[in-house]
Curated annotation (Swiss-Prot):
Coiled coil: none annotated. Zn(2+) binds at residues 492, 495, 509, 513. Keywords: Coiled coil, Cytoplasm, DNA damage, DNA repair, DNA replication, DNA synthesis, DNA-binding, DNA-directed DNA polymerase, Magnesium, Meiosis, Metal-binding, Nucleotidyltransferase, Nucleus, Transferase, Zinc, Zinc-finger. GO terms for biological process: DNA damage response; DNA replication; error-free translesion synthesis; error-prone translesion synthesis; meiotic cell cycle; translesion synthesis. This is DNA polymerase kappa. It catalyses: DNA(n) + a 2'-deoxyribonucleoside 5'-triphosphate = DNA(n+1) + diphosphate. It comes from Schizosaccharomyces pombe (strain 972 / ATCC 24843). It comes from the Eukaryota. Residues 132-316 form the UmuC domain. HAMAP family: DNApol_IV. It is an enzyme of class 2 (transferase). GO terms for cellular component: chromatin; cytosol; nucleus. InterPro entries: DNA/RNA_pol_sf, DNA_pol_Y-fam_lit_finger_sf, DNA_pol_Y-fam_little_finger, DNA_polymerase-Y, DNApol_IV, Rad18_UBZ4, Rev_trsase/Diguanyl_cyclase, UmuC. Mg(2+) binds at residues 136, 226.
Length: 547
């Protein structure tokens, strides 16, 4: 009995989740969480370290109050709070079982051993031999506009229309950031200069940057128009440089300097043993700097232990709020509470939490390859609501054109299309349709997209998107077609002649072959021509279809 008490006490002591107490919710708590939600996902963007976030949140809250957007976010925040409360109740249930249920205590021990084994398996498979670098352009769109007009460097400036895509570092000091509605940004910073998007120019500049980076890694992997992953392992070997911290940081500094000199754009870099860690590292010292995470288990463990969960790219806002509701604030907290989390979250979500908390990631840079790239999409937010079918369909055509160009550029095809739209009430809807063949052209993509769109009329929307899913490469698609064509005929199980592989035609032919007179005729012919040949054992339909 004493051992059982020790087990419970140590478990509760080590597992902070099991001591959660209900502090009572209030209207002020609801208001606080809603304000944080309205602040958006970009509050962690660099350049806002000295911003009075509480004041900015208050401005956003007051400016949004009474709008349909406010009501929609209020509803989502309420739903999230209820979900968190439900999880807290689950934790209390497990706490009680762990105290009084011996069977559950044994189950807990087994679960702990299973989790430990999973962690050790991940550790054993972790590759610490590759030098992965995440290159992130600093305020990319804004930087290009500043190159065109240097006067903008000293002014608070943002790029976008209706909703901001990015802001320069002067504007960020006021609290202006990406994904912020323009009218709210102007309340925060009345002198804000807003420049319209020029995506064609940004794409050209992105290509210039890629040309520089490709000199160090020919298998460069673009993650977006302004983010790139590199593997510098081969480069250091070719340069006969030892894999020391000094050599690695020196090469990355050289890359950053060359990008700036040749393109005018500054970049920040994260250096680590895998993509997940490199992505986290690139945000540590922005702008125009770099950060190195050690290439050993001890160094990685020390770094991850104190890392706030919000800084991990694999943990979104909703999941972060759920974790905070369970008093989990750092990746170390996740690690120490993996057993209880394995009960609360679905297996896929739990595996993601485990992987993220320990910094387990891939070193394979093939995000644009078909093995990793699952979808290609394009969407647009409109400055005013759209309700005219002709205008909506015109916008859809532009989006489909963009998706088609991206598919062709990457040598991919699709057999499934989806549309997404957000109504004037901020309700998001998605519809998807499978297609009987693989396609990539604008005209082929537009037809099913229009069918999905027209199912939803009448509608008033503020956002529209198109997405191609279930992607495969053109080469693989061609191989599949050739294989199908080669199997387009099959041998008859009776006479062995090749017959068109269509059920009706095949059945008709087999019926003919099985006709008694035909079989007799074939047998007589065989005996007359070769009376000494042994009779071959006849095939049966069962044998044929079972082969």
């Amino acid at each position: 009995m004493e051992n059982a008490k020790d087990f419970i006490g140590e478990t509760i002591k080590e597992n902070g989740l099991l001591t959660i107490e209900d502090d009572g919710s209030s209207s002020s708590d609801e208001e606080a969480t809603l304000k944080r939600r309205l602040a958006g996902p970009s509050v962690l963007k660099s350049g806002q370290e000295n911003v009075n976030q509480k004041k900015i949140n208050e401005i956003i809250y007051e400016a949004s109050k009474g709008s349909k957007f406010f009501e929609a976010e209020q509803k989502r925040d309420r739903e999230l709070r209820l979900r968190i409360e439900k999880v807290q109740v689950e934790v209390e249930k497990y706490q009680s079982k762990l105290r009084f249920d011996k069977a559950f205590q044994r189950e807990w021990t087994i679960r702990q051993e299973s989790v430990d084994t999973t962690v050790e398996d991940f550790r054993a498979k972790r590759d610490l031999t590759q030098i992965i670098v995440h290159v992130d352009c600093d305020a990319f769109y804004a930087s290009i506009e500043e190159l065109k007009n240097p006067k903008l460097k000293s002014l608070p400036m943002a790029v976008g229309k209706s909703v901001l895509c990015t802001a320069n570092y002067v504007a960020r000091k006021f609290g202006v950031r990406s994904a912020m509605p323009e009218f709210i940004a102007r309340k925060i910073c009345p002198d804000l200069v807003v420049i319209p998007l020029n995506l064609s120019e940004y794409a050209i500049k992105s290509k210039e940057i890629q040309n520089v980076l490709a000199q160090y890694d020919s298998n460069l992997c673009p993650a977006s128009i302004d983010e790139f992953y590199m593997n510098l392992t081969s480069h250091l070997r070719l340069q006969e440089l030892a894999f020391t911290v000094e050599n690695i940081t020196m090469v990355v500094e050289k890359i950053r300097k060359q990008v700036h000199e040749e393109t005018g754009v500054t970049v920040s870099c994260g250096i680590a043993a895998n993509k997940l860690l490199a992505k986290i590292a690139s945000n540590k010292r922005k702008p125009n700097n770099q950060f190195f995470i050690p290439f050993d288990e001890i160094g990685i463990s020390k770094f991850m232990n104190d890392l706030p969960v919000r800084e991990v790219s694999g943990i979104g806002r909703v999941l972060e709020q759920q974790l905070l509701g369970l008093e989990i604030k750092t990746c170390g907290d996740i690690q120490r509470n993996l057993v209880i989390l394995s009960y609360i979250f679905l297996p896929k979500s739990f595996q993601n939490l485990l992987r993220c908390s320990y910094g387990f990631g891939t070193t394979i840079l093939d995000e644009y390859g078909e093995s990793k790239r699952k979808t290609i999409g394009s969407e647009a937010t409109f400055s005013s609501n759209l309700s005219s079918p002709s205008i909506i369909e015109y916008k859809l055509r532009l989006l489909v054109q963009n998706v088609s160009e991206n598919l062709q550029k990457r040598g991919l095809v699709t057999n499934s299309i989806a549309i997404k739209y957000k109504t004037s009430e901020f309700q998001v809807h998605t519809k998807q349709k499978s297609i009987g063949q693989f396609i990539h052209s604008e005209s082929d993509l537009l037809k099913p997209a229009l069918q999905l769109l027209r199912q939803s009329y009448p509608m008033t929307i503020r956002l529209l998107g198109v997405r191609a899913t279930k992607l495969v490469s053109k080469s693989r698609c061609l191989a599949m077609q050739l294989k199908f064509q080669s199997q387009n005929t099959v041998p008859c199980p009776v006479c062995q002649k090749n017959i068109e592989n269509e059920l009706g035609i095949l059945n008709q032919h087999v019926d003919l072959c099985l006709n008694v007179e035909t079989v007799k005729s074939l047998i007589n012919t065989d005996h007359t021509a070769n009376p000494t040949i042994k009779k071959r054992k006849s095939n049966t339909l069962d044998t044929y279809f079972l082969e």
